[in-house]
């Protein structure tokens, strides 16, 4: 609730798009749930995305808010933020981005602090107003064959995917008492679906993104 309140305090409306540019980490999942609790739509961006890919996804999705992981990520996106004249610094850009916060620069703490004036009831209203048919996320391809292509996924789509995993033998990993290490990019549908299944199924999840330390001897 506290992080969702921060988004609401920043003027995020029901159905607004919020971009999330980060490698796999705990804050990624926290922000994803907070975006949904605020009634908004998450727009994951691969941490390895190029400048042109980031610009395209921000413009195409209509994201009004973004959370990055590192200073390098923020630098790639900063020229897309609207200036005082209501236009982005990047000439010719159609970006609608109003603000960027950075995970490594206390984004979570900032959102919690800014959301303090918001009542729990306002978050409850956003949650109750969200229907299964509503858009939950715009998921883009990695862009290996051209511009990243966006896929519109509703809350019903995610619930169906999670139900399929939990009713499959693979669903055993999501049972209470199980422990799962999530290390694949959460911008990828399968990794995110498994992550959601673990959360809903009652398992315990850890996040990691340093592939060099995941080798098996």
Residues covered by each model-derived region:
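Conserved AMP-binding/adenylation subdomain of ANL enzymes
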Residues: 159-179, 186-217
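Short beta->alpha connector loops at strand-helix junctions that form conserved
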Residues: 45-47, 69, 209
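ANL superfamily adenylate-forming
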Residues: 72-132
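Conserved AMP-binding/adenylate-forming
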Residues: 3-49, 183
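Short hydrophobic alpha-helices that are characteristic scaffold elements of the AMP-binding
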Residues: 32-38, 60, 188, 199-200
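Conserved pre-ATP/AMP-binding loop-to-beta segment of ANL
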Residues: 118-140, 147, 173-179
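Conserved structural elements of the adenylate-forming
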Residues: 1-2, 132, 151-172
């Amino acid at each position: 609730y506290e992080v969702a309140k921060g988004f609401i305090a920043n003027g995020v409306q029901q159905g607004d798009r919020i971009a999330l540019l980060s490698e796999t980490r705990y804050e990624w999942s926290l922000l994803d749930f907070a975006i949904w609790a605020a009634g908004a739509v998450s727009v994951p961006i691969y941490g390895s995305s190029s400048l042109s890919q980031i610009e395209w996804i921000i413009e195409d999705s209509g994201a009004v808010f973004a959370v990055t992981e590192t200073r390098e990520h923020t630098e790639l996106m900063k020229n897309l933020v609207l200036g005082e004249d209501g236009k982005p610094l990047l000439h010719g850009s159609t970006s609608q981005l109003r603000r960027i916060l950075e995970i490594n620069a206390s984004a979570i703490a900032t959102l919690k602090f800014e959301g303090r004036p918001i009542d729990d009831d306002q978050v409850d209203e956003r949650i109750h107003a969200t229907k299964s048919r509503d858009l939950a996320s715009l998921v883009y391809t990695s862009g290996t064959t051209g511009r990243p292509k966006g896929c519109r996924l509703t809350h019903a789509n995610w619930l169906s995917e999670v139900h399929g995993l939990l009713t499959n033998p693979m669903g055993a990993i999501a049972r209470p008492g199980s422990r799962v290490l999530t290390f694949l990019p959460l911008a990828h549908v399968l990794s995110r679906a498994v992550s959601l299944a673990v959360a809903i199924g009652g398992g315990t999840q850890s996040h990691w993104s340093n592939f060099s330390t995941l080798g098996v001897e």
